[in-house]
Protein backbone atom coordinates (compact mmCIF):
# COMPACT_ATOMS: atom_id res chain seq x y z
CA UNK A 1 0.00 0.00 0.00
CA UNK A 2 1.17 3.53 -0.77
CA UNK A 3 0.33 6.67 1.23
CA UNK A 4 -2.02 9.09 -0.53
CA UNK A 5 0.65 11.78 -0.25
CA UNK A 6 3.17 9.73 -2.26
CA UNK A 7 4.06 11.72 -5.40
CA UNK A 8 5.39 8.89 -7.56
CA UNK A 9 6.56 9.31 -11.13
CA UNK A 10 5.83 12.31 -13.33
CA UNK A 11 7.47 11.16 -16.55
CA UNK A 12 4.64 10.17 -18.87
CA UNK A 13 4.49 13.66 -20.36
CA UNK A 14 5.97 17.10 -19.85
CA UNK A 15 4.72 20.37 -21.36
CA UNK A 16 6.13 23.87 -21.19
CA UNK A 17 3.68 26.34 -19.62
CA UNK A 18 5.71 29.58 -19.72
CA UNK A 19 8.51 30.99 -17.60
CA UNK A 20 9.95 28.21 -15.48
CA UNK A 21 6.61 26.36 -15.20
CA UNK A 22 5.84 22.94 -16.65
CA UNK A 23 2.88 20.55 -16.64
CA UNK A 24 3.76 16.90 -15.93
CA UNK A 25 1.57 13.81 -16.21
CA UNK A 26 2.08 10.63 -14.20
CA UNK A 27 0.90 7.29 -15.54
CA UNK A 28 -2.31 5.49 -14.57
CA UNK A 29 -1.06 4.87 -11.05
CA UNK A 30 0.88 2.21 -9.15
CA UNK A 31 0.60 -1.34 -10.51
CA UNK A 32 4.09 -2.73 -9.98
CA UNK A 33 3.02 -4.43 -6.72
CA UNK A 34 0.79 -7.51 -6.78
CA UNK A 35 -2.75 -6.36 -6.00
CA UNK A 36 -5.29 -8.11 -8.20
CA UNK A 37 -4.25 -9.70 -11.49
CA UNK A 38 -7.84 -9.62 -12.76
CA UNK A 39 -7.53 -5.82 -13.05
CA UNK A 40 -3.84 -5.88 -14.09
CA UNK A 41 -2.94 -4.82 -10.52
CA UNK A 42 -4.38 -1.35 -11.20
CA UNK A 43 -6.16 0.71 -8.55
CA UNK A 44 -8.65 3.56 -8.30
CA UNK A 45 -5.76 6.04 -8.38
CA UNK A 46 -7.21 9.27 -9.76
CA UNK A 47 -5.75 10.49 -13.06
CA UNK A 48 -4.03 13.86 -12.64
CA UNK A 49 -1.44 16.34 -13.78
CA UNK A 50 1.19 18.15 -11.74
CA UNK A 51 2.31 21.75 -12.07
CA UNK A 52 6.02 22.08 -11.35
CA UNK A 53 8.68 24.73 -11.58
CA UNK A 54 12.20 23.95 -12.78
CA UNK A 55 14.86 26.37 -11.57
CA UNK A 56 18.44 26.45 -12.84
CA UNK A 57 21.16 27.79 -10.57
CA UNK A 58 24.86 28.03 -11.26
CA UNK A 59 26.92 25.25 -9.70
CA UNK A 60 29.77 26.96 -7.89
CA UNK A 61 31.16 23.81 -6.28
CA UNK A 62 33.77 23.31 -8.98
CA UNK A 63 32.64 19.73 -9.64
CA UNK A 64 29.81 18.24 -11.62
CA UNK A 65 27.64 20.03 -14.16
CA UNK A 66 27.64 23.78 -14.70
CA UNK A 67 24.09 24.18 -13.39
CA UNK A 68 21.89 22.58 -10.76
CA UNK A 69 18.25 21.86 -11.56
CA UNK A 70 15.73 22.23 -8.73
CA UNK A 71 12.19 20.93 -9.38
CA UNK A 72 9.37 22.16 -7.13
CA UNK A 73 5.83 20.80 -7.10
CA UNK A 74 3.39 23.73 -6.93
CA UNK A 75 0.05 22.00 -7.58
CA UNK A 76 -1.62 18.68 -8.29
CA UNK A 77 -4.84 18.80 -10.30
CA UNK A 78 -7.21 15.81 -10.38
CA UNK A 79 -9.01 15.03 -13.65
CA UNK A 80 -12.80 14.83 -13.55
CA UNK A 81 -15.97 14.89 -15.62
CA UNK A 82 -19.15 16.86 -14.93
CA UNK A 83 -21.10 14.00 -16.50
CA UNK A 84 -21.44 10.44 -15.20
CA UNK A 85 -18.62 8.03 -16.00
CA UNK A 86 -18.59 4.24 -16.30
CA UNK A 87 -16.92 2.48 -13.36
CA UNK A 88 -16.39 -1.23 -12.81
CA UNK A 89 -18.38 -2.88 -10.04
CA UNK A 90 -15.64 -5.35 -9.17
CA UNK A 91 -18.13 -8.22 -9.44
CA UNK A 92 -16.41 -11.49 -10.34
CA UNK A 93 -12.96 -9.93 -10.15
CA UNK A 94 -11.85 -11.40 -6.85
CA UNK A 95 -10.45 -9.66 -3.80
CA UNK A 96 -7.97 -7.02 -2.83
CA UNK A 97 -4.63 -8.16 -1.47
CA UNK A 98 -6.03 -8.03 2.10
CA UNK A 99 -8.80 -10.47 1.19
CA UNK A 100 -11.66 -7.97 1.08
CA UNK A 101 -13.81 -7.80 -2.09
CA UNK A 102 -12.40 -5.66 -4.87
CA UNK A 103 -15.45 -3.39 -4.88
CA UNK A 104 -16.29 -0.49 -7.14
CA UNK A 105 -13.69 1.20 -9.30
CA UNK A 106 -15.12 4.63 -8.46
CA UNK A 107 -12.70 6.72 -6.36
CA UNK A 108 -14.03 7.46 -2.87
CA UNK A 109 -13.49 11.18 -3.51
CA UNK A 110 -16.37 11.12 -5.99
CA UNK A 111 -18.88 11.33 -3.14
CA UNK A 112 -16.82 13.77 -1.12
CA UNK A 113 -16.43 16.25 -3.96
CA UNK A 114 -19.66 15.49 -5.84
CA UNK A 115 -17.91 14.83 -9.13
CA UNK A 116 -16.75 11.98 -11.36
CA UNK A 117 -13.01 11.37 -11.36
CA UNK A 118 -11.08 9.53 -14.04
CA UNK A 119 -9.12 6.59 -12.71
CA UNK A 120 -6.46 4.14 -13.78
CA UNK A 121 -8.37 0.99 -12.82
CA UNK A 122 -8.60 -1.25 -15.86
CA UNK A 123 -12.24 -2.37 -15.42
CA UNK A 124 -13.62 1.19 -15.45
CA UNK A 125 -15.50 0.92 -18.73
CA UNK A 126 -19.11 0.40 -19.73
CA UNK A 127 -21.21 -1.13 -22.46
CA UNK A 128 -22.68 2.12 -23.82
CA UNK A 129 -21.15 2.88 -27.19
CA UNK A 130 -20.77 6.48 -28.25
CA UNK A 131 -19.91 5.52 -31.83
CA UNK A 132 -23.14 3.69 -32.66
CA UNK A 133 -21.49 0.35 -33.45
CA UNK A 134 -23.12 -2.94 -32.33
CA UNK A 135 -20.53 -3.42 -29.63
CA UNK A 136 -19.00 -1.06 -27.13
CA UNK A 137 -15.63 0.31 -28.19
CA UNK A 138 -12.74 1.65 -26.19
CA UNK A 139 -13.40 5.12 -27.64
CA UNK A 140 -16.47 5.64 -25.45
CA UNK A 141 -15.81 9.02 -23.77
CA UNK A 142 -17.98 7.99 -20.81
CA UNK A 143 -15.44 5.39 -19.69
CA UNK A 144 -13.69 6.36 -16.47
CA UNK A 145 -10.45 4.53 -17.16
CA UNK A 146 -7.81 6.97 -18.33
CA UNK A 147 -4.08 6.39 -18.64
CA UNK A 148 -2.43 9.82 -19.13
CA UNK A 149 0.50 10.00 -21.50
CA UNK A 150 1.22 13.05 -23.69
CA UNK A 151 0.30 16.54 -22.51
CA UNK A 152 0.25 20.00 -24.09
CA UNK A 153 -0.92 23.40 -22.85
CA UNK A 154 -3.35 25.53 -24.86
CA UNK A 155 -1.99 28.78 -26.27
CA UNK A 156 -4.10 30.83 -23.87
CA UNK A 157 -2.76 28.79 -20.94
CA UNK A 158 -6.24 28.04 -19.62
CA UNK A 159 -6.50 24.36 -20.49
CA UNK A 160 -4.42 21.25 -21.08
CA UNK A 161 -4.75 18.51 -23.69
CA UNK A 162 -3.91 14.98 -22.52
CA UNK A 163 -3.66 11.81 -24.61
CA UNK A 164 -4.17 8.32 -23.22
CA UNK A 165 -3.49 4.65 -23.92
CA UNK A 166 -6.80 3.01 -22.94
CA UNK A 167 -9.04 4.56 -25.60
CA UNK A 168 -6.98 5.98 -26.98
CA UNK A 169 -8.42 9.34 -25.99
CA UNK A 170 -7.46 12.98 -26.33
CA UNK A 171 -9.25 15.06 -23.71
CA UNK A 172 -9.15 18.76 -22.98
CA UNK A 173 -9.24 19.74 -19.30
CA UNK A 174 -9.60 23.04 -17.49
CA UNK A 175 -6.15 23.83 -16.14
CA UNK A 176 -7.48 25.29 -12.89
CA UNK A 177 -10.20 22.79 -11.96
CA UNK A 178 -9.18 19.66 -13.86
CA UNK A 179 -12.71 19.24 -15.22
CA UNK A 180 -13.00 17.89 -18.73
CA UNK A 181 -13.98 20.44 -21.35
CA UNK A 182 -14.00 18.22 -24.43
CA UNK A 183 -13.24 14.71 -25.68
CA UNK A 184 -11.99 14.69 -29.26
CA UNK A 185 -13.31 12.10 -31.72
CA UNK A 186 -10.30 10.14 -33.01
CA UNK A 187 -10.16 7.85 -36.08
CA UNK A 188 -12.34 4.80 -35.42
CA UNK A 189 -9.59 2.35 -36.41
CA UNK A 190 -7.59 3.30 -33.30
CA UNK A 191 -10.21 1.88 -30.91
CA UNK A 192 -10.79 -1.76 -30.01
CA UNK A 193 -14.28 -3.25 -30.14
CA UNK A 194 -14.12 -5.45 -27.04
CA UNK A 195 -12.73 -4.23 -23.74
CA UNK A 196 -11.41 -6.39 -20.91
CA UNK A 197 -9.91 -5.59 -17.52
CA UNK A 198 -6.88 -7.74 -18.39
CA UNK A 199 -4.81 -6.20 -21.14
CA UNK A 200 -3.44 -9.51 -22.39
CA UNK A 201 -6.99 -10.72 -23.02
CA UNK A 202 -7.86 -7.54 -24.92
CA UNK A 203 -4.92 -8.11 -27.20
CA UNK A 204 -5.95 -11.63 -28.31
CA UNK A 205 -6.80 -11.76 -32.01
CA UNK A 206 -9.88 -13.78 -31.08
CA UNK A 207 -11.17 -10.76 -29.15
CA UNK A 208 -10.01 -7.78 -31.22
CA UNK A 209 -8.99 -7.87 -34.86
CA UNK A 210 -8.12 -4.19 -35.11
CA UNK A 211 -7.35 -1.16 -33.00
CA UNK A 212 -4.64 -0.01 -30.64
CA UNK A 213 -2.24 -2.47 -29.08
CA UNK A 214 -2.62 -2.88 -25.32
CA UNK A 215 -0.43 -0.41 -23.41
CA UNK A 216 0.73 1.10 -26.70
CA UNK A 217 -1.86 3.79 -27.32
CA UNK A 218 -1.43 7.51 -27.93
CA UNK A 219 1.86 7.90 -26.14
CA UNK A 220 2.82 11.26 -27.60
CA UNK A 221 0.99 14.53 -28.18
CA UNK A 222 2.18 17.72 -29.89
CA UNK A 223 0.55 21.04 -30.68
CA UNK A 224 1.30 23.36 -33.59
CA UNK A 225 2.79 26.78 -32.75
CA UNK A 226 -0.48 28.56 -33.56
CA UNK A 227 -2.31 26.30 -31.09
CA UNK A 228 -4.96 25.22 -33.60
CA UNK A 229 -3.90 21.63 -34.32
CA UNK A 230 -2.99 18.68 -32.12
CA UNK A 231 -0.77 15.88 -33.42
CA UNK A 232 -1.10 12.49 -31.72
CA UNK A 233 1.53 9.76 -31.90
CA UNK A 234 0.74 6.09 -31.34
CA UNK A 235 3.39 4.04 -29.59
CA UNK A 236 2.94 1.14 -32.02
CA UNK A 237 1.05 0.37 -35.23
CA UNK A 238 -2.58 -0.56 -34.67
CA UNK A 239 -3.23 -4.31 -34.34
CA UNK A 240 -3.07 -6.27 -37.58
CA UNK A 241 -1.75 -3.20 -39.38
CA UNK A 242 -0.32 -4.17 -42.79
CA UNK A 243 2.78 -2.05 -42.22
CA UNK A 244 5.00 -1.35 -39.21
Name the predicted role of every residue range.
Residues 1-244:
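Sequence/structural signature of beta-propeller domains
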